[in-house]
Structures are given as C-alpha cells and as structure tokens.
Amino acid sequence: MTKTIFISTKENTGSIEFQIVNFTKKICKLTDHLKLHKKDYLSQRGLRQMLGKRQRLLVYLSKINLPSYNDLILKLKIREAKKDLS
C-alpha cells in the first residue's frame, strides 16, 4: 500500500486522508505482529486505540467530504464507519 496515491503534495501530511492511510498502514503492521505474538497485550491495546482513532477520522471525513470518504474506503478496502446517531 502506498501513500502517494492519496497525497497531493508533501506539505499535506496533516490532511485527514493522509492520516487515515497512515493509521491503516500501522494497523496492518501491528496485526501482522500480533499474529506471531498472541499474548502481547500492550500491542493489542495500542491496536484498539489506533482502530478507534481511524474510525473517528473516517466518521469526520464522511461528514465533511462524502465523495472523498467513499473513494478512500474503496481504495483501502476497509469497512464503512458507523454513523453517529446524534
């Protein structure tokens, strides 16, 4: 998975899309680590935190820019974020 697909310029590292791609890359690495080290509970906690952060960013992106959100979840092959009921 490359970040260059989603980044328009190098100064755009704070964009929501870049952050989601970065979290997805970290989540994939940590998932591979946890397949080998099943009892690494601190890493499991870190994974849950990253998943939560990515999920919150996805919800925010879906609220402000729905076409970009749909494009991103298709390219990254991740599930759709749960919508807020409030």
Curated annotation (Swiss-Prot):
Location of the protein in the cell: Plastid
Record's keyword terms, sorted: Plastid, Ribonucleoprotein, Ribosomal protein
SMART domains named in the record: Ribosomal_S15 (SM01387)
Main subcellular location: plastid
Keyword Ribosomal protein: yes
InterPro entries according to UniProt: Ribosomal_uS15 (IPR000589), Ribosomal_uS15_bac-type (IPR005290), uS15_NS1_RNA-bd_sf (IPR009068)
Highest taxon in the source lineage: Eukaryota
Pfam families, per the entry: Ribosomal_S15
Keyword Ribosomal protein: yes
One example GO MF annotation: structural constituent of ribosome
Biological process terms in GO annotation: translation
A cellular component annotation (GO) from this entry: ribonucleoprotein complex
HAMAP family documented for this protein: Ribosomal_uS15_B (MF_01343_B)
Assembly notes: Part of the 30S ribosomal subunit.
Family, per entry: Belongs to the universal ribosomal protein uS15 family.
Protein name, as recorded: Small ribosomal subunit protein uS15c
Organism this protein belongs to: Cuscuta gronovii
Gene behind the chain: rps15
